Regions:
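Short, C-terminally biased terminal segments at protein or domain edges
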Residues: 1-124
């Protein structure tokens, strides 16, 4: 079990969560009811699932939680793209979208590492 704060992907996803919470405050409720809350919940789920994963006792379970973090990453991207379309005052959010994509690549790589580790534990 490792400390998630030692992982760059966790630290960067925490930073992104803080940034997107600020962005979410700029989404007017009348333009997109519930979208702000959905965005906040989904972005918080990324570092939460990374942390939950690294706390698991087996590489296979770590990989499972990283897969959930990847799915949350896609969800955040979708909510953010929708918010940009519905609320032009938010701007393009290009930096946040780029960071989401970079984090996703990091998560895929980390998940692959744990999947391989899980397979090697099962192979006699």
């Amino acid at each position: 079990m490792q400390n998630p704060a030692n992982l760059e992907v966790w630290r960067r996803s925490m930073d992104l969560a803080v940034e997107l919470h600020r962005v979410a405050r700029g989404i007017p409720g009348r333009s997109a009811p519930g979208l702000s809350a959905q965005l906040r919940r989904a972005v918080a789920s990324i570092p939460a699932n990374i942390a939950e994963g690294v706390g698991q006792p087996s590489p296979g379970l770590v990989a499972k939680h990283l897969a959930i973090a990847i799915a949350s990453n896609f969800e955040v991207e979708t909510h953010l793209l929708l918010a940009v379309r519905l609320c032009p005052s938010l701007g393009t959010c290009d930096e946040a979208l780029d960071e989401l994509r970079q984090l996703r690549r990091m998560l895929y790589a980390l998940r692959t590492h744990y999947q391989r580790q899980s397979l090697s534990e099962r192979t006699p």
